[in-house]
Amino acid sequence: MSTYLRGLKEKAMAELQAQPSIDGKEKPKFMALQQVYEWRRALKDLIPNDRPILSNCVGFVVTLIPAEDLLQKPLSYVASQIRHTLIEQGSREQIEAYTSLIRQDPINRAPPLFGDTSMKLLMFTNWQRARLYETDFSAASVNKLDGPLFPSYIQAVPGPYEFNDGLILFGKDSSGNYWFGGQRAQGQWGMMERKIEEGMKDF
């Protein structure tokens, strides 16, 4: 395991160092695109199939990409880089290496952050496949119901870190509405709302 982790570190450092300065210019700034990834498929032999289990089984995959590429190259390029990351970091060996880093944090058991201190971290997560709004809570209802009882609102409480930039797609409710959540640095949420409104003009 330590050999594998060492190899990943050496590869990451080599890729960062492979961006030389040209004519005295600074090296390009990188962005860290972090997304939630489900581990159940890779770890299915560890999850009992003969009884219920209620537990998170997710981690993060991180795509390091030059900010210049993020701004200037087509969205399809960014998507291909993220797809490559999902394949590479979704392997059983990679997941075991990742969780070994989590266990090194005895207090929070928090996932590690990758990159350097100059990076901008952007977090995105799509929970639609979890079908949270299709969870039936009728068994917990005080009054007897004739049909299912679905949630009307879902809220995420991040921790142990307080991130200042992230978006969550919670999913689609029973009325067909899509719910988003997120956090931005203080004073920047107004700009976020304007951008969302601009993007929704054609819908």
Q: Where are each of the predicted segments found?
A:
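Acyl-CoA-dependent O-acyltransferases
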Residues: M1-F203
